[in-house]
Amino acid sequence: VVTDFTQKELPTNTPRKDVFAFIEKELKEIIPLLPSGITYGRFTQNVANTLLARLYLNAEVFTGTARWQDCLDACNKVQGYSLTANYKASFAIQNEKSPEIIFAIPYDHKQGTVGNYLASMTYHYNQKLAFDPAGVYQWCGNGICAQPGLYSSFDAKDVRRQSLLIGQQYSAKDGSEVLMDDGSPLNYTEEIDNFTDAAKNAGARLNKYEWSANDSW
């Protein structure tokens, strides 16, 4: 933990008990300074108390002393939320009115984030052809994928399984198979054949967030 920005020496590792105390102190100090209520995309007292609750939840691991009552007290200060009936509603583009989002980071071109950067990083370059008849999508990076086995760890009826994209992709224009640049089908596999030189379609992709063809640089 470094609090003096004029310090020139390399910092040493701080014991986890001290890190815990530092985070607790910081959160408790800022809570009175933060706005109350629910504000989309802004850090509020609810957000800080949620983080404080998570900190206390793991207090015994970090410090050796359980803080269950403090965790409960922090949870009881987080008010005004409820679960949505539709699991995917909180991950939709227009989710500002979601009753369960405590803290959101807006990802769209209006906020200067070029849409959902994380989701774009995971799609194959030609995934745009499955999204839009004209192939309009801000960009696809084919950069990251899920660990093997994650997709199958969810029961087939578990809605959370839909958060991962797997299998053959089809054109939004005519229903034909989307192909990769080498002419082979864009068929996402759960397994990864070679971690140092993986096939471009290896690994399940992130499919949790609603995509938009209208976001742009």
Predicted ranges, named:
Residues T63-G64, T113:
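Short, solvent-exposed loop/turn segments that connect beta-strands within catalytic domains
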Residues T3-F5, N76-Q79:
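Short edge-strand/loop segments of extracellular domains
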Residues V1-T44, Y56-T63, D215:
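Aromatic-anchored glycine-rich loop motif in surface-exposed flexible loops
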Residues G80, T84-W217:
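Elongated scaffold/linker segments in the mid-to-C-terminal portions of large proteins
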Residues R16, G41, Q45-N46, C71, ...:
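Active-site-proximal structural scaffolding
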Residues N49-L52:
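TPR/Sel1-like alpha-solenoid repeat signature
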Residues I30, C71, K77-S82:
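Alpha-helical solenoid scaffolds that mediate protein-protein interactions
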